[in-house]
Design a protein with these regions (language model features):
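Short sequence/structural elements of tandem HEAT/ARM alpha-solenoid repeats
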Residues: 44-48, 84, 192-196
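Catalytic phosphate/nucleotide-handling subdomain of diverse soluble enzymes
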Residues: 58-74, 78, 144-220
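Acidic, carboxylate-rich catalytic segments that either coordinate divalent cations
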Residues: 96-122, 126-135, 184-227
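Accessory "access/gating" subregions that flank catalytic or transport cores
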Residues: 2-23, 32-43, 51-56, 70-167
């Protein structure tokens, strides 16, 4: 929608607002991992880059999710403590936002001993994945990501499967959980049986790019990080 608005002459932030029903959807949150990768240990810089990117197409919670993920990934480069990673991500979004409130509700529930089953039931009670707006909104998907990391107990497979099995935007949540988990724990924490089928290939779905080598993308990311 933002691209269409560009063609019509709208620039940010109007490009994110004009006739855009997707402005608080998950689209920005799922494209800002890179800013965390290239800013290890600098969540403020990662969140700033994510904000600049997300503001083109999203507003409010749509932006906050992007900033949260970027900042969390940046912090995951220097610690494997999931709670610290989540709280660092939250430190870079407005504390008066619904996004902050939703994530903190999950974090506090986890700390207070709420079971995994009850946590995910609460998410489904609060948000309806069967509505056109609800299934892809940033907030429910962000808290599914957070809950999966917390209740996954440091197990890669358990964490990503939990994110996918819970519903809503399943592929995006599994990917974000895997991204944060991998940054925090390193590739050695990901069992070989999860890596083998990938065969070092990434299908980008980008016209003119197609399939690329993951290891080559990693090398380019490291080069950018060192600049």
């Amino acid at each position: 929608m933002a691209f269409c608005n560009f063609i019509k002459g709208y620039e940010p932030p109007c490009s994110a607002i004009y006739k855009n029903p997707y402005r608080e959807w998950i689209g920005a949150q799922i494209r800002t991992d890179y800013y965390g990768y290239i800013n290890p240990g600098n969540p403020e810089a990662a969140a700033d880059m994510a904000w600049r990117d997300a503001s083109i197409s999203h507003i409010k919670n749509g932006i906050y999710g992007a900033m949260f993920v970027a900042a969390a990934l940046s912090t995951a480069a220097i610690t494997d403590n999931i709670e610290d990673i989540i709280l660092s991500g939250l430190a870079h979004v407005p504390h008066t936002s619904r996004f902050y409130e939703d994530v903190m509700q999950v974090v506090n529930g986890y700390k207070n001993g709420i079971s995994c089953k009850e946590c995910f039931e609460n998410i489904h009670e609060k948000y309806d994945e069967y509505t056109g707006y609800g299934w892809c909104h940033t907030n429910p998907n962000a808290i599914i990501t957070v809950a999966s990391l917390l209740y996954g107990e440091g197990n890669y497979g358990k964490s990503i499967c939990m994110a996918v099995e819970t519903g809503f935007d399943t592929d995006c949540n599994g990917a974000t959980v895997g991204s944060i988990f991998g940054m925090a724990h390193g590739i050695e924490s990901i069992p070989e049986y999860w890596q083998r089928p990938i065969k070092d290939k990434l299908q980008t779905s980008i016209f003119g790019v197609g399939t690329v080598s993951i290891s080559e993308r990693v090398a380019k990311t490291l080069t950018q990080m060192r600049k």
